[in-house]
From Swiss-Prot, chains A, B:
The keyword S-adenosyl-L-methionine applies. It comes from Oryza sativa subsp. japonica. It holds the Pfam family Methyltransf_7. Keywords: Magnesium, Metal-binding, Methyltransferase, S-adenosyl-L-methionine, Transferase. This is Indole-3-acetate O-methyltransferase 1.
Amino acid sequence: MTMAMASMKGENVTVSAAAAPRMKKLASMLCMKGGNGDGSYLNNSQAQALHARRMLHFLEETLDAMMERSSSDKLFTAADLGCSCGSNSLFIVDVIVRRVSEAYESRGRDAPEFQVFFSDLPSNDFNTLFQLLPPLLAPVAGSLEECLAAGEGAATATRPYHAAGVPGTFYGRLFPGESIDVFTSTFSLHWLSQVPEEVGDSASPAYNGGRVFVHRATEAVAAAYKRQFQADLARFLRSRAREMKRGGAMFLACLGRSSGDPADQGGAGLLFGTHFQDAWDDLVQEGVVEGEKRDSFNIPVYAPSLQEFRDVVRADGAFAIDRLELVRGGSPLVVDRPDDAAEVGRAMANSCKAVAGVLVDAHIGERRGAQLFERLERRAARHARELVEKMHFFHVVCSLSLAP
Amino acid sequence: MTMAMASMKGENVTVSAAAAPRMKKLASMLCMKGGNGDGSYLNNSQAQALHARRMLHFLEETLDAMMERSSSDKLFTAADLGCSCGSNSLFIVDVIVRRVSEAYESRGRDAPEFQVFFSDLPSNDFNTLFQLLPPLLAPVAGSLEECLAAGEGAATATRPYHAAGVPGTFYGRLFPGESIDVFTSTFSLHWLSQVPEEVGDSASPAYNGGRVFVHRATEAVAAAYKRQFQADLARFLRSRAREMKRGGAMFLACLGRSSGDPADQGGAGLLFGTHFQDAWDDLVQEGVVEGEKRDSFNIPVYAPSLQEFRDVVRADGAFAIDRLELVRGGSPLVVDRPDDAAEVGRAMANSCKAVAGVLVDAHIGERRGAQLFERLERRAARHARELVEKMHFFHVVCSLSLAP
């Protein structure tokens, strides 16, 4: 089981803060198999598998509760928000289709037709996603059940659902009113819709001069990031509440943090707020990048605490919280030999690049971007042992249903 | 008003017969404006504009008749099949949304929410299409009407509908049952799902040895092409009948021919069955391409007669024919100076390349493909006057509704 960050860059990516490739973590773990054997990775892969199974269990629990509540329509619609280019999204959709079909079957009803929407920003590489889709299962009577009964192999060889791609931001409306039975969004909601304006405004007390992320920033900066996250999540919930069918459900997972302090971003802080920060400072001191250039760069990511997340859901009021937990996840660093400092350094640079490379290149160009990640690699290698020990993510995992 | 073929090649095109870029004609005329003044094009642009307006009128008539029949739901769904990378499709969708909104308004009802599906093969460049989409109009009460009232400029600046891309072949199922109000497909249905098998089988009496298109081919070849077209259209209609909502409608336009003889393909015949054919023969005689290589290449396009089209719709039986006409269209050749033989030759080669270039390159490679189109350009230049006079398309235009 690999710990890889699954973010991919499309060929035609239009660069903007909101268009950055998504951080993907659990989802990629969930659908990857094999690897180089137990203990070959930085963290214990068995512990990882446990976490992954636990989160998958949450999703299934969400679906089961929904099937208890809802009537059995002839059409079941699902939407995965922040689908990226695909394989993780396809795995989650397979879980949904299988579980819902089983629920229909256990009530002695014919399985519904499924329609699945894969949504992401217009800059996402939908072409790759669409070419990953297996061919549609011929809608012959009984064949859906046969396919599901045949297990995973068959389920990925054909596709027992109608598929569609939906370009747009999930911080606004994406679907007609009351049209979706189940929403999922895994590892996208920690991406803010934008860097908070005050944070880039040198006249503001929340100006994040000198720093490139909220981690270890001032109280005013931290408050601005928190406000942005909560405003974005509120807009997300307001749109979904309009789009969800009566009896529908939503499964959300995103980066989270265990600390109450917004300026202590945990794993995300270690990723963007320490050696990555120092690498920027290196470039400024070497005269490669001007100080103002660094000051105007900020990573639009925020790992919320459970409380911050819960407050937004409650204030919105449209959804009941069926489950809300902070789950300890793994490390984004993929290494075969955790004792090899050079390899750890490379893994750290690669992880950062996979997530923030597009943003960095758009801000200072590819050439200086490459220099930045070289500095990062060198610095991370010098702190390899500490990174191996301390680098891991927490995830907010949340199951919601429309409040009665 | 330009006569350009609007086919575009996506960057990640997976080549297969069915994945060839679509022939686009009317749709591009409909949404193009300006040009280099009256009479600057090969054909009289005013006559073209008349044809275009007439076909647009058919679409509006189809919509009006549908609005008479159907109840006013809160959600109106449209699907454009064979959307290619977009601008033509976006224009047609704008017409639909505007017309349907006006119909609701004239009955004193609130405009519905619109959901529009853009469908094409998985190899289509959906990324380009999605980046052409204007941003979603904020669903504020009254703003849809304001937008529509503001006319074309506003309608293209924002998007008063939810959009989704659907990858798949329209010769099979694409959507859930009874989920679409109106289908459109413009200039795609003349693409066969495949070259008829017999045509590529040297042991068959319908083997098309020596030729690369059905035009001027043997009776057996012509019959095989005709069978393939009719079988494909039947599969198209069967799927749409399942997917269309009660009271729904369908507007179809594709290449057609005025001759009763399937081996006389009219404009398509002139495009693929004369100088293009001779250019292949040149390469064979020069030893650049082996005879068998040419013999195994066939263009999977078929321009049906009205009667052939009508027979399939009647045999299927699910749809009533509200209108079925053969409309004289324009020429695919874009030239500023019709007297300039070299320019006419270039235009002919470009038109052929835009439609069949991907297929040719997949069959004999890019280098020899370029040689083929060079020969074509030279030959077409020698027959420039004849091409200017005789090259024009006919279009089958068809409006269908679910039979009661």
